[in-house]
Structures are given as C-alpha cells and as structure tokens.
C-alpha cells in the first residue's frame, strides 16, 4: 500500500435557496481539507452569485473535483476528464473530514 | 436595518416540535416589523423544510424562507429550553436555531454576504460553543458582529 499524501482538491457548492448550505458546505470542505494538509479551492454558486471562481490552473492541478448534487452546477464542462465526486451539501457539512480522508486513501491506491 | 437585533433573539425558547419553533420565531420576526405577511412566511419556511431538512447537525437547525412575505433580511436566533427532533443529518437533536428570513428580491444584497459569513462560522465548533454559553442576547450579537467583521475583512 502506498503512502497517503496530501492531495489537491477543488469543489463547487450550491443549494436550492443559495443562502446557507452553499457556504456551510464550502467552509466545511475547506476546513477539513486544510486540516489534512491538502490544497483546496472551493467555488460557491449562491444567491450572491459565483464567488471564489476556480482558476483554470487550480482545476488543472486538482486530483479530484467535488461537486454538490442538490441542484445543478453551472459551467460543469470545465471538469471534463477530471475525477469528479458528487455529494450532497449536507454530507459535506457533516462529513467533510471523512470524505477528505477517504479520497486521500483512495488516491494513494492508484 | 441590522440583520440581527435583540428583539429577534430568544435564549430560552420553550417548544416541543419544529413547526411550533418555526412559528414562534416567525412571530418574533413579525413583531419586530420584519415581515409583510406572517402566515405566508411560516408556510414558506415549512415548505422549504419538506424539501430537505435544515437540521445540519451539531445541534443546529437553519430553517429559512425566501419569499416576498419578508420585508427585511433577518436572522432570528433561539436557544431551546429542551432539545427537539429536527430530522437532523447526524440524527441528533437540535438546541440552537438560526431562522433566516430573506426577501425574494434580495439579489446582490450586501446582507446576503452577512448570512453567508454567518453560515460559514457555524461550521466552527468554537463559534457554536460561544453562542451556546452566551449569557445575554447582546453577547450573542457581539459575537456575531465580531466574527462577521472578521469574515468580511478577508
């Protein structure tokens, strides 16, 4: 088994009303990823509009893309060819530390 | 108008179930002159609740209504006398409610940034703990404004 190493993550979060879950999910993912030593960028698509838009470089460098599946994500074609994980914003809010750990373990197997 | 004021905070709300809690907080918002239509707002919040639960875990629920029944963007806060069921994502009971009221037409509103910053803060345990141990409504407001100021500076 290979060594589990920090990975590069990007994510996009959105939710039906776009006022709360979007931001909680983003914060939770960022906090968990940083705690695990990973590089992380999370774009929010809420009522305010798009914030922290992912750069082309960040997407290119990402080992995995995490998208919330509560509602559609805008400009999803940016992630063509990337490894994409779809989870609910609720799962990101509650389980980001576990999700990040599992992704790190999974990528170490490759 | 500020998004949270003392008159929409109840640090010892007595309630048995979530619909009653939503109604009581709706009444607080209405009394503070922040709604156009109390029933319309309550129905909107309860309808939102049926889409997916707003019990986000950590003992917190964030019911919200986005409707023209809301006049001013607001967050009513309640600490519950006894924790209640909220079909939470982590299965736990809820003892802290942040009930949002957002006008339908609030696109681009600066206040939405405050709500997003508050939502982000709720992810952090130390922030939740401080709200749980606050002695007065003013203390809660101070905590929130401090953290929001910090969040908006970054």
Language-model-detected regions and their locations in the chain:
Chain B
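Cytosolic covalent-transfer regions centered on His/Cys nucleophiles
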Residues: 1-154
């Amino acid at each position: 088994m290979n060594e589990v190493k920090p990975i590069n993550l990007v994510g996009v979060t959105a939710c039906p009303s776009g006022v709360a879950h979007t931001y909680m999910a983003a914060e939770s993912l960022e906090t968990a990823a940083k705690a695990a030593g990973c590089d992380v960028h999370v774009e929010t698509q809420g009522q305010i509009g798009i914030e922290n838009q992912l750069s082309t470089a960040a997407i290119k460098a990402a080992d995995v893309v995490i998208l919330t599946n509560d509602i559609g994500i805008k400009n999803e074609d940016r992630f063509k060819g990337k490894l994409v994980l779809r989870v609910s914003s609720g799962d990101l809010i509650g389980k980001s530390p576990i999700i990040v750990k599992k992704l790190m373990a999974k990528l170490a197997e490759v | 108008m500020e998004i949270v004021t003392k008159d929409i905070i109840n640090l010892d709300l007595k309630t048995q179930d979530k619909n009653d809690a939503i109604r009581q907080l709706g009444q607080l918002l209405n009394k503070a002159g922040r709604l156009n239509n109390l029933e319309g707002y309550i129905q909107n919040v309860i309808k939102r609740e049926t889409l997916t639960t707003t019990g986000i875990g950590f003992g917190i629920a964030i019911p919200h209504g986005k409707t023209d029944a809301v006049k001013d963007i607001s967050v009513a806060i309640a600490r519950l006398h006894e924790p209640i069921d909220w079909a939470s994502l982590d299965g736990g009971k809820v003892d802290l409610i942040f009930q949002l009221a957002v006008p339908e037409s609030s696109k681009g509103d600066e206040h939405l940034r405050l709500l997003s910053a508050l939502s982000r803060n709720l992810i952090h345990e130390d922030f939740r703990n401080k709200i749980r141990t606050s002695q007065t409504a003013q203390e809660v407001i101070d905590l929130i404004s401090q953290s929001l100021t910090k969040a908006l500076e970054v």
